[in-house]
């Protein structure tokens, strides 16, 4: 049972990296076309729940890692990641030079930093966000207390150790993905 909880946490962590992170924008066409059976009602990746919402978010946002065709993990917005010997700390090193554009009305490109990921995870655990994905990260340090409103979001076990270095702290040992 403990192994399944560990496996579930790792799978959720990887899925959320994809769903929660910001997109790296490049030059080129400003149009995007895809087929869905209904119009997405929500483009917020932290609360997207319908199939059309999720498909849209998967096509709009990039993650720290991605799955390759053979099912293994490869860096996407990170250069690499490390897992501590006790498997309680996951450290991701972001690629340098990643940017995002906030909105059509503000064409400024902003640098993507570890603080952006920290903000996303902290927001996911705010009681008012009602993110269905928060439960998938229950192994993060202080996650239950933050979700219950007993501790501030800043107490969550996600930190920006450096501008391009993101650290996740876990309460349980996690089996490293293979």
Indicate residue ranges for each PLM-predicted region:
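Surface-exposed binding/hinge segments that line
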Residues: 115-118, 123-175
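Bacterial N-terminal signal peptides that target proteins for export
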Residues: 2-11
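Short, well-ordered beta-strand elements
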Residues: 30-41, 89-92, 117-120, 166-167
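Short, ordered beta-strand-loop transition motifs
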Residues: 28, 82-88, 158-165
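N-terminal lobe/hinge region of extracytoplasmic solute-binding protein
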Residues: 35-85, 122, 129
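Aromatic- and charge-enriched surface segment that lines or borders ligand/interaction sites
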Residues: 79-133
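C-terminal motif of bacterial Sec signal peptides marking the signal peptidase cleavage site
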Residues: 23-24
